[in-house]
């Protein structure tokens, strides 16, 4: 108990000392956004790299110019029950928050396979089925949706919402918007593409030599290999569509309509899959 309390105190201190905060539910791809921003800032400010994603070290090199970013775990929402998710975000008051979301069905599928294959340090190994998991009280689909809803328009907190899907469809464009939101000025436009190319999650094989991520930073969505003989090209565009039973998809769609506010910046209606 004391150890957990002291850990929360240290995190709170880091949030208070920071200029901007990166926040996401686990399995939303936050490491990718973090390292993309880190590569961009090393290029823009002409700083030495160090450990990829370590914003504190970048800030220490030039405190007068570099915004101090902190990647927050936001009280580990994947370990919470729905009624434990807090709407109150006053700890982030006065900060610029970058909130990353992802299609919740992909998030919950990815989280299930991570827990059922390897588990979490702070969670027990999950033995149930995917259909069981999405209906769990602790860290289930309802918890995820209520967490998303809590970040729709929190009082007195500035939030720039980024979707995982947009991040991968147009990483340079998303990076440009994020840098403007963070107040980074006089940017050479070519740096956005350069940062993308130096980030392994976006830049292909050449980027792997230009920027070395921390171990495990670029885990792909943890979905099992298909055993039905389908080729990659024949698989649905959304990974979750091949993981859930039709009843589960219908249930999750109803949950999304019930818990996500109408103004939540996400796809309220499903896109047709070709």
What residue ranges belong to the model's regions?
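PAPS-dependent sulfotransferase catalytic domain
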Residues: 1-161, 234-274
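PAPS-dependent sulfotransferase catalytic core
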Residues: 193-255
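Short, surface-exposed acidic
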Residues: 47-52, 183-194, 204-205, 262-267
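Residue-identity detector for glutamine
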Residues: 57, 61, 177-180, 198, ...
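PAPS/PAP-binding and catalytic site of the sulfotransferase fold
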Residues: 29-43, 161-186, 204-205, 220-221
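Short, solvent-exposed coil/turn elements at secondary-structure transition points
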Residues: 75, 103, 165, 198-201
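Short aromatic-enriched loop/helix-cap "lid" or pocket-rim segments at secondary-structure transitions
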Residues: 109-113, 120, 174-175, 204-208
């Amino acid at each position: 108990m004391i150890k957990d309390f002291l850990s929360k105190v240290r995190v709170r201190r880091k949030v208070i000392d920071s200029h901007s905060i990166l926040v996401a539910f686990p399995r939303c791809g936050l490491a990718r956004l973090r390292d993309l921003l880190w590569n961009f800032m090393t290029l823009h400010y002409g700083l030495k790299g160090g450990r990829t994603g370590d914003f504190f070290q970048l800030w220490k090199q030039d405190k007068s110019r570099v915004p101090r970013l902190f990647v927050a775990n936001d009280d580990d929402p994947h370990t919470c029950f729905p009624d434990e998710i807090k709407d109150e975000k006053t700890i982030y008051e006065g900060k610029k928050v970058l909130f990353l979301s992802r299609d919740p069905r992909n998030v919950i599928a990815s989280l299930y396979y991570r827990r059922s294959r390897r588990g979490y340090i702070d969670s027990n190994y999950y033995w149930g089925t995917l259909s069981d998991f999405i209906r769990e009280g602790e860290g289930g689909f309802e918890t995820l949706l209520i967490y998303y809803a809590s970040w729709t328009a929190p009082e007195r907190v500035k939030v720039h919402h980024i979707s995982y899907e947009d991040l991968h469809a147009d990483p340079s464009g998303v990076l440009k918007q994020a840098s403007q939101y963070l107040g980074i000025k006089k940017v050479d436009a070519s740096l956005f593409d350069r940062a993308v190319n130096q980030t392994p999650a976006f830049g292909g094989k050449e980027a792997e030599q230009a920027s070395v991520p921390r171990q495990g930073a670029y885990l792909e969505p943890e979905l099992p290999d298909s055993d039905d003989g389908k080729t990659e090209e024949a698989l649905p565009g959304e990974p979750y569509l091949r993981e859930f039973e039709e009843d589960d998809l219908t249930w999750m769609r109803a949950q999304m309509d019930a818990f996500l506010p109408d103004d939540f910046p996400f796809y309220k209606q499903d896109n047709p899959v070709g």
